[in-house]
């Protein structure tokens, strides 16, 4: 991937203040670059290259995998949920790639703030749109409750998204999504004790989905493993790259659960009261 001679890279102390968010990554920072210079950084080694490619390759894979494995012809009136699911799967890696690729733009902190907001929007979309099919299927046989639950979760997501966009730190952004996670756990619990419905194998996928996402967030906040060896993980294997890989796994688990859930909802007949 890295086969061009790049510019002279900066150390942490020489990098712009808005890029000094991980004091344990000591080297490999790109200098301020034009848009074309940012694109050129796809082809030389720097400390954001792993972040760009982990989500860039995932995005390309999801663009093929998610629409092709969605049984559109069998979803009937629930086809819109297939569309929201596709957006939920594609938004996080798309926002992430743009953020990491252009974060060294010569526009400085103003451009960086917009890119960070775009990245957070991707996370907000997967947390919001990703849960709608889950709630829809869990409450498939409770039509009086389902609309209220969908609207309530959407409103909650709007509040969480705003808090994440205005959060002053990585840990604050992680906490901003806590209420959404709690709401999803409530839905999972309802399904687990028989108060909700859905495909039999989907619930374990959803539990793994949130477990991977939470683990990735905690690793990123803790700055592990680079905290144990500052400078040793500047290019490969640092906490943010680990979080990226775990988030890809989380999205795959979401997809593995939603597809059978939507198929189940399309063919299941609820018992009459």
From Swiss-Prot:
InterPro entries attached to this UniProt entry: AdipoR/HlyIII-related
GO molecular function: molecular adaptor activity
TM segment ranges: 52-72, 79-99, 115-135, 147-167, 185-205, 245-265
GO cellular component: Golgi membrane
GO BP annotation list: protein stabilization; regulation of ceramide biosynthetic process
UniProt entry keywords in alphabetical sequence: Golgi apparatus, Membrane, Transmembrane, Transmembrane helix
Tissue distribution: Relatively widely expressed in a range of tissues. Expressed in subcutaneous white adipose tissue.
Subcellular locations according to the entry: Golgi apparatus membrane
Membrane topology: Multi-pass membrane protein
Induction (free text): Expression is up-regulated in subcutaneous white adipose tissue of obese individuals.
Main localization category: Golgi
Family indicated by similarity: Belongs to the ADIPOR family.
Function: Plays a role in maintaining adipose tissue function through the regulation of ceramide levels. Mediates the stability of ceramide synthetases, CERS2 and CERS5, and their activities.
Subunit organization: Interacts with CERS2 and CERS5; the interaction regulates CERS2 and CERS5 stabilities and activities and is inhibited in presence of ceramides.
Protein name stated in the entry: Progestin and adipoQ receptor family member 4
The gene coding this protein: PAQR4
């Amino acid at each position: 991937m890295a086969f061009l001679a790049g510019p002279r890279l900066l150390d942490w102390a020489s990098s712009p203040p808005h890029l000094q968010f991980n004091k344990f990554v000591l080297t490999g920072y790109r200098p301020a670059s034009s848009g074309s210079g940012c694109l050129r950084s796809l082809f030389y080694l720097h400390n954001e290259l792993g972040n760009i490619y982990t989500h860039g390759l995932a995005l390309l894979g999801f663009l093929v995998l998610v629409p092709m494995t969605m049984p559109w012809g069998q979803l009937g009136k629930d086809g819109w949920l297939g569309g929201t699911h596709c957006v939920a799967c594609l938004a996080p890696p798309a926002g992430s790639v743009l953020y990491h690729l252009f974060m060294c733009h010569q526009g400085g902190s103003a451009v960086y703030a917009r890119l960070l907001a775009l990245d957070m929007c991707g996370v907000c979309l997967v947390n919001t749109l990703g849960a709608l099919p889950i709630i829809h299927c869990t409450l498939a046989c409770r039509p009086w409750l389902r609309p209220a639950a969908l609207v309530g979760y959407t409103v909650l997501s709007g509040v969480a998204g705003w808090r994440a966009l205005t959060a002053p730190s990585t840990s604050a952004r992680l906490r901003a999504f806590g209420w959404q996670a709690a709401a999803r756990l409530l839905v999972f619990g309802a399904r687990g004790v028989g108060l909700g419905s859905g495909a039999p194998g989907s619930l374990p996928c959803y539990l793994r989905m949130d477990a991977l996402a939470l683990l990735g967030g905690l690793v990123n906040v803790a700055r592990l493993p680079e905290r144990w060896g500052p400078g040793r993980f500047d290019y490969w294997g640092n906490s943010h790259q680990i979080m990226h890989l775990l988030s890809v796994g989380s999205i795959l688990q979401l997809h593995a659960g939603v597809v059978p859930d939507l198929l189940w909802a399309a063919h299941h007949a609820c018992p009459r009261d």
